[in-house]
UniProtKB/Swiss-Prot annotation:
Cystine pairs: none
Identification of the protein by name: Glutamate--tRNA ligase 2
Gene name, Swiss-Prot/TrEMBL: gltX2
GO-annotated molecular function: ATP binding; glutamate-tRNA ligase activity; tRNA binding
Motif range ('KMSKS' region): 249-253
Reactions that this protein is recorded to catalyse: tRNA(Glu) + L-glutamate + ATP = L-glutamyl-tRNA(Glu) + AMP + diphosphate
Organism: Bartonella henselae (strain ATCC 49882 / DSM 28221 / CCUG 30454 / Houston 1)
Length: 459
């Protein structure tokens, strides 16, 4: 049975790049009747926050992702300690006492000599006396995993290829001799990503690990750790990364691209899903109506080899497709939450929806119709025409037909036509050069407000 996982770190709001990984895993599980696990990577107890755990849960629910199982790494420290002890007893996890400054100095020396900045396993040469001396000085060891890239002497590395058939990129090869032994445990005893992740993947019987291709190099070391623990290897699949237009990686520090902020800004869930899943693939980004249809077009092998660049303008364009199709009943509650209510709200929505990119944009049009306006958009040469238009405004309650009657009368009286006829009236009544049909604007403003604005803008 297919079993995948999404393992976010709750140290901030997750962004569209994170959720892209979640959606790939979720859709893959759905396509194969598999199981989707949500695993919170919260071993960093200082930076992990409950508010972000809660936010991730809300984000996933908003995107239609329903985890089958939920785990917290912070509740599994005893298990990680147990595995770490096994590795120590087998000599596969060894203590190192170098400070960060010492390691940095070694890397700089290696680079100056045009050598790869790979850890030289100097800690393996330490005598028990030297270790005690470091301990007496107050140094605490960090612990490295001994990669199997040697025959008998770990100080004599040899080329050791680790190969796997990547579900996205095909055959991949990593030479373990080109890697530093990964640090699994920090000086303070806390765990870095690798050991808890591998132990969890083993214990939870994860069959497929689908993640960003920035993890490809890590995969070589992780495969070595899987094998050291006599575990069955999962299938790895590495998808291209999502970057900014400038090619920079997405960060939790950039809150503008967090799912939390995109949702608050009024983006549609399905728009975010379609862009996240289809960008950076051989498919066009298409506004599929729901997740079920998106699933029909999802194919892991369609992923491109090059990075995918995220442009908020693309998301806005895609979002507008969905907004223009939303009925009043579908947005009624959301409009109420935006303080848009009253007798004409349904008429208002039907008038403006094709002119907005997000539901939240309705607020701008609502304020334009109901608030006192101080816009000054009518050209001086058009103000006499605006004053004249007031005299030809149809009598009675204004409706959509009133616009046609009004403009025909103005055309006959003034000889104006086209833009010269319509634009000054639109500017006088809305302060804008574009927008909904003017017949609907007249109906929404009402006779009293139309007269008031024509008087002000004609002065």
């Amino acid at each position: 049975m297919i079993k995948v996982r999404f393992a976010p770190s709750p140290t901030g709001y997750i962004h569209i790049g994170n959720i892209r990984i979640a959606l790939f895993n979720w859709l893959y599980a759905q396509a194969h009747n598999g199981t989707f696990i949500l695993r919170y990577d919260n071993t960093d107890v200082e930076r992990s926050k409950q508010e972000y755990i809660d936010a991730i849960a809300v984000d996933l629910e908003w995107l239609g992702i329903q985890p089958d199982e939920i785990y917290y790494q912070s509740k599994r420290f005893n298990r990680y300690d147990e595995v770490a002890e096994i590795l120590k007893q087998r000599g596969l996890l060894y203590p190192c006492y170098e400070t960060a400054e010492e390691l940095d100095r070694r890397r700089k020396i290696q680079l100056s000599r045009k050598l790869p900045p790979v850890y030289d396993r100097a800690a393996l040469k330490l005598t028990p006396e030297k270790k005690r001396e470091f301990e007496t000085q107050g140094r605490k060891p960090h612990w490295r995993f001994l990669l199997p890239n040697f025959e008998n002497d770990p100080l004599q590395k040899k080329r050791t290829e680790v190969c796997w058939n990547d579900a996205v990129k095909g055959k991949q090869t990593i030479d373990l001799a080109s890697l530093s032994d990964p640090v699994l445990i920090r000086e303070d005893g806390s765990y870095l990503y690798t050991l808890p992740s591998v132990v969890d993947d083993i214990d939870m019987a994860i069959t497929h690990i689908i993640r960003g291709d920035d993890h490809i190099t890590n995969t070589g070391a992780q495969i070595a750790l899987f094998e050291a623990l006599n575990a069955k290897l999962p299938t790895f699949g590495h998808i291209n990364l999502l970057t900014t237009l400038l090619g920079k990686g997405l960060s939790k520090r950039n809150n503008d691209l967090s799912i939390h902020s995109l949702r608050a800004d009024g983006f549609e869930s399905i728009a975010v899903q379609c862009l996240a899943v289809l960008i950076g693939t051989s498919q066009n980004v298409h506004p599929y109506p729901n997740q079920a249809v998106l699933l029909e077009h999802f194919n892991l092998q369609d992923t491109s080899r090059s990075v995918a660049k995220f442009d908020i303008a693309d998301l806005l364009t895609l979002n507008s497709h969905f907004v223009h199709e939303l009925t009043y009943e579908e947005v009624k509650k959301r409009l109420e939450n935006l303080s848009i209510n009253g007798e004409k709200v349904e008429c208002f929505w039907n008038a403006i929806r094709s002119n907005i990119n997000k539901v939240n944009d309705a607020v701008l049009w609502w304020k334009m119709l109901h608030d006192e306006q101080n816009f000054d958009t009518v050209a001086l040469e058009d103000r006499a025409f605006v004053r004249q238009s007031l005299n030809l405004l149809p009598e009675g309650t204004l409706n959509e037909e009133s616009w046609k009657v009004w403009t025909v009368a103005l055309k006959e009286k003034t000889g104006r036509r086209g833009k010269a006829l319509f634009m000054p009236l639109r500017q006088a009544l809305t302060g804008m050069d574009h927008g909904p049909e003017m017949g609907k604007i007249l109906q929404l403003l009402g006779r009293e407000k139309v007269i008031e604005r024509l008087i002000i803008q004609g002065e």
